[in-house]
């Protein structure tokens, strides 16, 4: 559809822990679309969003919201109710992918390789017992992650029970549920997919430690290799095949990013899908698009062109 004659709202900011990143993503999309001559308004989302959308006469929404209330199907459902087409996955796909436990169960049921994990709620006594069970089955490092946040907010890498318990407490401070996931040693890769088209793989190489929030959004903390070097054809094909399968199984559309670990034997392990990838100057999806000659204005326009209801 041609959106040139429509009033476009870039929805950004919001109420989650990822607000600051969202503001940067939204600003990048706003500038890109404005440079192409679109009628675009940047809207910082709060609890009065319905009134703002009506007042501004928004006819299509470009979503740059990260985390809860933005990537979990909430804003998508509101826009469906208001009859405003929007970018990215629909309500169901957004909810599935935002819930790391739910999406991993779906991956596992469909035969897609994903690291072993357990899920924990706010009951610390139960958490202690489950961590003991996890340690009985697996040795070495694990990652503790909130089940419904992105941008590596609240994530810890832990070895041993004491670190795991501290990691669980940290994760539960930002969410009422978390998971302990077996750490797979290997290369960190990410695959950006736009409307079913896979972009070149990126290898993520943190200067030190693991790829946490600071490494993601602080210049100079991480090296990004585009395309990922020294990948044999078999591993490359496997990553793309698994990423596209996950994209379709979850019902995704638009721009989505799949994160992987490639172990020492060349086996890719699917970690998660990100349904509204970051669009900042350090973000991965724009880097992958650039590698195939798609600059930010064109990427923003392609994202916009995929806007729809349901």
UniProtKB/Swiss-Prot annotation:
It catalyses: 2 D-alanine + ATP = D-alanyl-D-alanine + ADP + phosphate + H(+). Residues 104-305 form the ATP-grasp domain. GO terms for biological process: cell wall organization; peptidoglycan biosynthetic process; regulation of cell shape. ATP binds at residues 135-190. It is found in: Cytoplasm. SUPFAM superfamilies: Glutathione synthetase ATP-binding domain-like (SSF56059), PreATP-grasp domain (SSF52440). Its main location: cytoplasm. Keywords: ATP-binding, Cell shape, Cell wall biogenesis/degradation, Cytoplasm, Ligase, Magnesium, Manganese, Metal-binding, Nucleotide-binding, Peptidoglycan synthesis. Binds 2 magnesium or manganese ions per subunit. It is an enzyme of class 6 (ligase). Its cofactor is Mg(2+); Mn(2+). Pathway: Cell wall biogenesis; peptidoglycan biosynthesis. Mg(2+) 1 binds at residues 259, 272. Mg(2+) 2 binds at residues 272, 274. GO terms for molecular function: ATP binding; D-alanine-D-alanine ligase activity; metal ion binding. One of its GO terms (cellular component) is cytoplasm. Coiled coil: none annotated. Its EC number is 6.3.2.4. Belongs to the D-alanine--D-alanine ligase family. Cell wall formation. This is D-alanine--D-alanine ligase.
